[in-house]
């Protein structure tokens, strides 16, 4: 009961305290805990029985004693104050300001647990989001309202890629700008500083809401952080009709926090020690993306997770892939060769891409060019494997042509500067110019009418450097 303090705890075990259950207590209820010195802590009920309740403390339990602690049940779940003044602010994982400015002045409170969008109320995602990154826009397109994760590995450039997407993302053909919500879970101080500095330098910080749960914060805070971020995103999208792009990093740290709390509670572990409800817990977060009837706003999610040991079959990327609508995969071998962004096009996928590209949305040739680039680059991988066995000199002329195509594809299509913002037309023109290296008979996934319409014009639209590289790489077979 709010306003009533109960003295005494039953036990203290790390961040978990056990207290006698009071009438009306409910799962997820926020509590206040005061030690004998008057210092206040906040906690959250994470388990209930007939006699007692299990409370996860937000912060250290040092200084708490069984007899000297007092407990108040606040009769509310975890809530976040929301208003448009959230934009440009930096908060901790629980929604408390850490940027030196005062608390958000708003009487509007929202339950951070939220609810997934009613399927009947959903609007199917169709609007193309231009990120300015060719490997995404051209071959693994991001659609407004989609949830498209980035599967990365420790030490790869996922932070730089996320910052670039936040700087450059726009909806093609409109002046509507994105509002960004960034949630960092278990990230180091230098990573947090990188994102803040990046947004300040490029002038987008005023359109970004940041929630930072750093590596030295309590585990339970990492579990609350994405829920606070999504609550802010839903308010801005569905009540203020803004297009919101939500970036989560790192979802692996979030899942590790879930495992830690689950172990503390004594739950039966599932795969690799993660709780059996990991799938449903992730779905609670990911399914809060989308568009709804009656609102022009949207929530688009890009969760970033680092795959332990670069293992895409690990439970975290495995379950994430079941819930989300594709994935962008960063590959270590591309990074080691100095390519940025090191996006592996072949293992990457956007399941909603087909519904957001084409005539009237991007360009009439988009689907055909993307499909042909996939097929041709897949052939490159086969030829490279063969060349590693028999040697490049023993390959037929057509296979040598594919090798040259693969090298230039990685150098000019996949690779770009982190401040280079390519339009979709530039991306498709680069794709056409690279495909011109191959014999016309090899462009079997493109309608001949599209080849006649776009090939010559696109080749003349690219940079002089790329045109020169293509001319130098041509073989007699490519001209046949």
UniProtKB/Swiss-Prot annotation:
Key word Lipid metabolism present: no
GO MF term set: ATP binding; proton-transporting ATP synthase activity, rotational mechanism; proton-transporting ATPase activity, rotational mechanism
Pfam families: ATP-synt_ab, ATP-synt_ab_N, ATP-synt_VA_C
CDD domains to which the protein is assigned, alphabetical: ATP-synt_V_A-type_beta_C, ATP-synt_V_A-type_beta_N, V_A-ATPase_B
Annotated InterPro entries: ATP-synt_VA_C, ATPase_F1/V1/A1_a/bsu_N, ATPase_F1/V1/A1_a/bsu_nucl-bd, P-loop_NTPase, V-ATPase_su_B/beta
GO annotation (BP), single: proton motive force-driven plasma membrane ATP synthesis
Keywords: ATP synthesis, Hydrogen ion transport, Ion transport, Transport
Keyword presence, Transport: yes
Gene3D superfamilies per the UniProt record, alphabetical: 3.40.50.12240
Family, per entry: Belongs to the ATPase alpha/beta chains family.
HAMAP family assigned to the protein according to its UniProt record, in alphabetical order: ATP_synth_B_arch
Role played: Produces ATP from ADP in the presence of a proton gradient across the membrane. The V-type beta chain is a regulatory subunit.
Record protein name field: V-type ATP synthase beta chain 2
